[in-house]
Regions:
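Rossmann-like NAD(P) dinucleotide-binding subdomain of oxidoreductase/dehydrogenase enzymes
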Residues: 1-127
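ALDH superfamily catalytic-core signature
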Residues: 52, 67, 89-186
């Protein structure tokens, strides 16, 4: 059994990612749903069951935020749990790592990193600028894989910076549900 823990801020893609590899390798999975979006995580399991995956292959546990520490401890300590996959904050990741270490369980942590983009001198500047802007501002930058550092070859740095400034000035912030606004207001 693999325990997967996915966050709220990209619930479909990150829960699917927590399930895909363990399932492809023939494992069953217990997905600890985020307390902020349990219905989304449960829906993924229901879709997989409807698609013929089989009863008990993907199991979803929902809980309140106050119960999270006890649920995590029990999932990790369970004798059938062989590995843990966690995507989320560095703070909670440290707790997961400590708990997994206590039970000698391997753990994969995908935490709030410093996701870099490297732009080489042969890059198409328009494409690079669009990729950096998307990576930095998609989901208002509130995802673990948001672009946080940009390393640009000295030969094109000035041009890149100029184009990135132009791009950021053109991005409108508003409610994404009310139009084509890639940057929502918090």
């Amino acid at each position: 059994v693999i325990v997967g823990m996915a966050p709220w801020n990209a619930p479909v893609i990150l829960a699917t990612r927590a399930l895909a590899m363990p399932l492809a390798c023939g494992n069953t999975v217990v997905l600890k749903a985020s307390e902020a979006c349990p219905a989304t995580h449960r829906l993924i399991a229901e879709i997989l069951l409807e698609a013929g995956l089989g009863e008990g292959v993907v199991n979803v546990i929902t809980h309140s935020a106050t119960d999270a520490p006890q649920i995590v401890e029990r999932l990790i300590s369970h004798p059938l749990t062989k590995r843990i996959n966690f995507t989320g904050s560095t703070h909670v990741g440290k707790i997961i790592a400590e708990t997994a270490a206590k039970y000698l369980k391997p753990v994969l942590l995908e935490l709030g990193g410093k996701a870099p983009v490297v732009v080489l001198d042969k890059a198409n500047l328009e494409d690079a600028v669009n990729a950096v802007a998307f990576g930095a501002f998609f989901n208002q930058g509130q995802i673990c894989m948001s672009t946080e550092r940009v390393l640009v070859d000295d030969q094109i740095a000035d041009q890149f910076i100029e184009k990135l400034i132009e791009k950021t000035k053109s991005i409108q912030a508003a409610n994404p549900l009310q139009g084509n606004y890639p940057l929502g207001v918090l």
